[in-house]
């Protein structure tokens, strides 16, 4: 018989808000609107620990994740998990019967690959986007979610263009959009990505033929923007399309400076 040291009373009786496992790599399949996505996400699962309890049962957290993932990849029940947030909620629900808690969080980090069409040659280019989904069970039993996307684009500087007869410097820009909302609110990650990507001077592509390169450069010079412009546009579009608390962060990797530029706002 094993000694359950986790159930002992700790020397310092302080409650902990988040205790669990992080950087757990696994596999998951999601059926979203008839299209199946396969992910290799990094998972983080945490629960609260009361002051009178020394620790948590780590194996039970992993077991809950494994069970939820196994259910998701079985063909006959794949449709049960229609989104990453549904998968996260399933992990929490399975955890409830294994590890008592008042509050729990599941965070899922992964990449979403979306096919895009190049601007001139009209070829298909598969573009990667960093996404993160958080599912939070509050102490009152309610659920909320946090959705984050990270998109790479570019900007052309309007100040240099206005002072150099149309010549300017260009740089890669990174736009991040976060939305915190009630769990029931439907917010597709793809739409969040579209909001960010359409706010740059021009989108970037993995595959570009010469005619596409020309189209991208011409598009950038026809649409010069400061990093502040990009942040404001993302924020305005997000407020128009989504309900929830919005956080926008844009970083411009400056090409003529040794520093970068940041613009950030939130609701």
From Swiss-Prot:
Catalytic activity, EC: 3.5.4.39
Co-factor requirement: Fe(2+)
The organism's place on the tree of life at top rank: Archaea
GO biological process, one term: tetrahydromethanopterin biosynthetic process
Any GO molecular function: GTP cyclohydrolase I activity
Annotated positions for site May be catalytically important: 157
Parts forming coiled coils: none
Pathway assigned in UniProt: Cofactor biosynthesis; 5,6,7,8-tetrahydromethanopterin biosynthesis
Keywords per UniProt: Hydrolase, Iron, Metal-binding
The reaction(s) this protein catalyses: GTP + H2O = 7,8-dihydroneopterin 2',3'-cyclic phosphate + formate + diphosphate + H(+)
Pfam families with a match to the protein in the record: GCHY-1
UniProt remark on cofactor binding: Binds 1 Fe(2+) ion per subunit.
Family to which the UniProt record says this protein belongs: Belongs to the GTP cyclohydrolase IV family.
Binding partners and assembly: Homodimer.
Role according to the record: Converts GTP to 7,8-dihydro-D-neopterin 2',3'-cyclic phosphate, the first intermediate in the biosynthesis of coenzyme methanopterin.
Protein name: GTP cyclohydrolase MptA
Organism: Thermococcus kodakarensis (strain ATCC BAA-918 / JCM 12380 / KOD1) (Pyrococcus kodakaraensis (strain KOD1))
């Amino acid at each position: 018989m094993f000694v359950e040291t986790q159930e002992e009373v700790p020397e310092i009786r302080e409650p902990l808000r988040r205790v669990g496992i992080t950087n757990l790599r696994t596999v998951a399949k999601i059926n979203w609107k008839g299209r199946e996505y396969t992910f290799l996400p990094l998972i983080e699962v945490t629960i609260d620990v009361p002051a009178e309890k020394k620790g948590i049962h780590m194996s039970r957290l992993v077991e809950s994740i494994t069970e939820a993932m196994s259910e998701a990849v079985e063909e006959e029940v794949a449709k049960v998990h229609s989104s990453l947030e549904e998968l996260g909620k399933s992990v929490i629900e399975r955890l409830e019967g294994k590890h008592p808690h008042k509050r729990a969080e599941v965070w899922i980090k992964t990449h979403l690959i979306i096919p895009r069409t190049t601007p001139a040659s009209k070829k298909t280019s598969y573009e990667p986007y960093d996404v993160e989904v958080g599912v939070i069970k509050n102490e009152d039993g309610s659920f909320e979610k946090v959705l984050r996307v990270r998109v790479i684009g570019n900007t052309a500087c309007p100040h240099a263009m206005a002072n150099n007869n149309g010549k300017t410097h260009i740089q890669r820009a990174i736009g991040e959009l976060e939305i915190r909302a009630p769990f029931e609110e439907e917010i597709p990650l793809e739409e969040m990505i579209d909001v960010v990507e359409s706010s740059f001077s021009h989108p970037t592509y993995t595959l570009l033929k010469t005619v596409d390169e020309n189209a991208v450069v011409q598009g950038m010079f026809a649409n010069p923007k400061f990093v502040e412009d990009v942040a404001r546009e993302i924020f305005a579009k997000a407020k128009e399309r989504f309900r929830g608390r919005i956080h926008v962060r844009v970083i411009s990797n400056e090409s003529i400076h040794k520093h970068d530029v940041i613009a950030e706002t939130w609701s």
